[in-house]
Amino acid sequence: MAYRNPLPVVVALQPVYDTQGTALVVVTRTIAPARGGTALPGGFIDDREDWRHALVRELQEETGITAEPRDVRLADAMSAPDGYLLLFGLLPERPAAELAPPAPTDETEGWDLLRRPTELAFPLHTLAVRAWFEGRYI
């Protein structure tokens, strides 16, 4: 019998606020899968890497935004039909003005703010965004 274990993926929920209200940080992807699509920042956990460290590493790699692993709280865990296990980590709300400015990275066109739930490039990201805007991750 062969076993296939799920591949763990971390996804960052970084709430921010400004004069227009509260929003979530999202990215526009420049790599497959979902090139050109809008998604939450995230990616694979490296071998023997703590999931909170992976989450803040991916957030910084894709947005330039820094955060502390100790500030990450597990908001949700969802299994994707393609064999991935997504761990959604919630970070504390921050002022948008204090974030690194949006700039292209190796994997994204930079970051933007999502001000209301909308369909994202990955269905589970869409579900998590909807849950966050409905207040289910508070």
Model features per residue range: what roles?
Residues M1-A39:
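N-terminal strand-loop-strand
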Residues G43-I138:
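Unchanged
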